[in-house]
Amino acid sequence: REQHPAPPFFHSFLGMSEAAATSPDVSSVLAALQALYHNPDAQAKQQANQALLQFQKTPQAWSTANALLLAQDVPLESRLFSAQTFRSKVTFDLDQLEGASQEQLRDTLLHALDMYATGPRVIQTQLCLALAALALQMSEARWGNVVPGMIERFGGAPSTVGVLLEFLTVLPEEVSMN
């Protein structure tokens, strides 16, 4: 299968430095996710959920989600939260990004789909939903031929056909919801 190299900005998406993986945002998100999924106290879970929902609305959520999505050494729920954050940010906060940053986001999400081509499927689905929502909001000049491009990128190898099918499944759902 054809390898797609990481975009040059992939590790520095939206100005994220190498130190981002140890930033207070990443640490805070990881702590809140730990509380949400593993703390037996219902009030702690509620507070963690509220903190995470508020965090997803911030501009910093773009780079933090990117850092966590790339980190293979963090728990699945952290990477899933990152993929869900991208979906939420694309749906509600895309205006926080200029046109060129939207193209970088597209390339970042495509590269992430390459990384997660063999699973976990729940992350693939969230990334496909984010890409479908992004495709609907980007101009054709910025991202023309969405479906043929996805077929070309993910349709040529058995290991990535599942990603293509997932995208082609969620795209019409996103169209009908928007």
Indicate where each model-derived feature is located.
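Short, Lys/Arg-enriched N-terminal segments with co-localized hydrophobic residues
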Residues: 1-15
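Karyopherin-beta/Importin-beta family HEAT-repeat alpha-solenoid scaffold
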Residues: 13-178
